[in-house]
């Protein structure tokens, strides 16, 4: 709850976006983002039922929030990155956007574990850029690994909380001319898992703009099961 309102994900019925947006406004809420047929909205709790049943609204529920994986680094030597560094290849002229749920403590590491200067941007609703340094140190750890591997690269620390925030961050990164997007994030059970869906579309959009997207994989390999669906 923030300022008496809760964040929600509104799925728009076909052809109903104008009506859905009007319902949100009439309830005293606001729309802060959009992705496909979904709107990211803030609403008074008392208005949730009315908006959920309004014209133009197919569904209303909790946002698709990001989940964080563990961060483990075996260091530069294990990757033989030090050999590249010795050859003068240290990431000069490369811009890397690290998209994460928070970069707590990053300020204290500037000039040591991180470059002396970084670009920060916060895409979480209602949060200023200063609150990039909050919530979790997961993104800070990821940025440190990137800096270890490419110490001369320029880093962009972009904070998100939802799938729609992520889409906005990707758009920003492309507009800033970044060369690499790095994510170590998970969204559980919100895409088909077959290389299609909203996240695949984001990655394709970045790739078409000449951006390499590097992402963590396999963190949940022993924590899930899949099989053919059967009606019990």
Give, region by region, the residue ranges found by the protein language model:
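Substrate-binding/access-modulating region of protease and related hydrolase catalytic domains
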Residues: 137-143, 153-232
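Autoinhibitory N-terminal propeptides
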Residues: 1-136, 145-148, 154
